[in-house]
Curated annotation (Swiss-Prot):
This is HTH-type transcriptional repressor NanR. GO terms for molecular function: DNA binding; DNA-binding transcription factor activity. Coiled coil: none annotated. Transcriptional repressor that controls expression of the genes required for the catabolism of sialic acids. Residues 1-22 are annotated as: Disordered. It comes from the Bacteria.
Amino acid sequence: MGLMNAFDSQTEDSSPAIGRNLRSRPLARKKLSEMVEEELEQMIRRREFGEGEQLPSERELMAFFNVGRPSVREALAALKRKGLVQINNGERARVSRPSADTIIGELSGMAKDFLSHPGGIAHFEQLRLFFESSLVRYAAEHATDEQIDLLAKALEINSQSLDNNAAFIRSDVDFHRVLAEIPGNPIFMAIHVALLDWLIAARPTVTDQALHEHNNVSYQQHIAIVDAIRRHDPDEADRALQSHLNSVSATWYAFGQTTNKKK
């Protein structure tokens, strides 16, 4: 029985009430694309199509499910958003494995919209503070000598980039990325990368001179963080990190206020 017929058979017998205490409550009719999506998702999860394997062509799926091309394309697009398939132009959809990046990517649009609301940036800055506070405490307690060496190298690149604002921003992001890599959890990495991307995109345009002064302060604060991690002092590492991120938040808030006054 095709999907369409199977669904239609479920709605043939509809009485105004079921039992003495229940009112009539018609079930919402699902779109054909949603039904195709659910069926394909179950087939993928049952390993009827293995990772890396191509799904049937759009025409074959249309015939199999007895639906039109728009329903098939909407279903495949929904599966792509879930990270279950990859779609390249001119090729059939290929089964893929969902990743942390897929999960975060789904949140990106909502996050950027939230950042544009009053107080949105402050909420995300607080989220970053809570998140990185845990990271530095973990680093101070568990970082290996090799991981501390990577932090020191990131700090050195930070130092070499002080006179180049674009380079310093990249080295700043890389420094915090090395911190996020220490636990070895890919979900932490995806969250960290997304948080910084969202926050940096929401920051105002600032003069080179103002940024240069900010760079020097951030670099000195990075030194304090690394020193505390090297001493395996989680409390001091946490204090240094919180001082750094609170300073960054206050500085960019001030930059934003200055920019708004000039408009």
